[in-house]
Amino acid sequence: MSDVFAPECEAPHEDFAVDGTVGNGSPGSTRADDGGAFGLGDSIVLGLLYFWLTSSIVAMGVALGVGYLPEVPTGAHKFDYDGDFYANWDGQWYKDIARHGYFYKEHDYSSVAFFPAFPLAGRLVARVTGLREEAALLVVANVFLAAAFALFSVYLRERFPDAPKDFRGYALLAMGILPTTFFFRMAYSESTFLICQILALLGIARRWPLAVVALVIGLGTATRPVGVALIPALLLYTKDQSATRGGYVLKSAMLVPLACWGVAAYMIYQAVAFGDPIAFARTQANWAARTAPSLGAKVVALATLEPFWTLYTPSAPGYWGKHTGPLDFPFSLRAADPFFFLGALGLIFLGFVKKWLSKYEAVSGACLLLIPYWTHGYEQHLTSMGRFAAAVVPVYPVLGRIAAAIPAPLVAALAAMSGFLLGAEAAFFVRWHTII
């Protein structure tokens, strides 16, 4: 069995050299962005520094929001709410799962829509430390985010040894300062999924055994349903590590189920607990703002970008302004969601065309965007697409490349603007303003 998962060929291919570097880099080469001075420990420290600096902006935004913004009455679900402002909206569902477990109602909102890895980690931390579940979830989210920054810094160092000066710092800054990344610091699952994604890409870059990469991706599928978007990259990696077509087919047949262990375990749980292994998928209909009259109509609508232009049509049911208060108007993520989504998709395309991204990074990035567009872009009027785009790791090396190529004063101005919006979005979020 172990031979099935072992590489059949050791020759490098077009995306990575055998040592995991790209271009003409080598383990002992001098890197353009750090002059060869940064080792593993320094890379980790650099990542943690950017985590602390950018998270400080979110913390200030939260403090200003709690201190000066009025709390908005909302019909959103509040489970045993006790002022846990960092666990608003989806965070309330995660808190309830961590505290009471899952429930499923066929024709009503149900907690099975939220995948288990993050709330179960929160429950474990709560049991061990005695913290309330919402506080434990906040700890989990930020510990995983700090780890993600450290790991991403290591990944950037190894994957892009010949990148321009300051590239790595700009890429780390982008991952911390884009406005929708404030969700990474709240009681949301984004940071948990982020680290799964970085681990999978790092594993491919370092030529980890196929089964290990598949297991990491499986954890991603236990965190978010879109974790399956990493499987195409695994299949490409498997192909590159297979000497024959037969070997590739055999390995793929064994690895794909392994890469789905998280969602498979969740489906088994739902089958036992609720008699329906796909309850998590069925309950999505209860969140839908509208339903497509047919599959064909949905395909046409998505292909013609109908969800985009109806979002800005005042007479359309999904018009963003109908759900936004006067104070929230300039900061509405509902209005900005299409721009984040299209921007991220454009960056993935640019990175692939310019050969800044490997095929693994490009295909995983594209799938991470297109799967949510297909599953609920129409039904939910593109809601949360900005949040989903923020959790697409391959976007950030491309932003780092662009930032390294433009004048530093312009980068500073853009960073200041983005940092302001980051803090503002956090401030509105903690007071239940309808910005999402």
Where do the language-model regions lie?
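Membrane-interface transmembrane helices that cradle and orient dolichyl/undecaprenyl
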Residues: 18, 160-165, 200-211, 238-242, ...
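Membrane-lumen/periplasm interface segments of specific transmembrane helices
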Residues: 55-72, 86-87, 227, 231-350, ...
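Short hydrophobic/aromatic helix or loop-helix immediately within or flanking a transmembrane segment
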Residues: 85-103, 107-130, 302-303
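Loop-to-helix entry region of an early transmembrane alpha helix in multi-pass inner-membrane enzymes
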Residues: 112-116, 120, 128-150, 330-339
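Transmembrane-helix motifs of polytopic, lipid-linked glycan transferases
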Residues: 124, 136-160, 343-350
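Transmembrane-helix signature of polytopic, membrane-embedded enzymes
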Residues: 132-135, 152-177, 358-363
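Multi-pass, polyprenyl lipid-linked donor-dependent membrane glycosyltransferases
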Residues: 140-144, 170-199, 203-204, 220-232, ...
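Signature aromatic-anchored transmembrane alpha helix within multi-pass, membrane-resident enzymes
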Residues: 256-260, 405-434
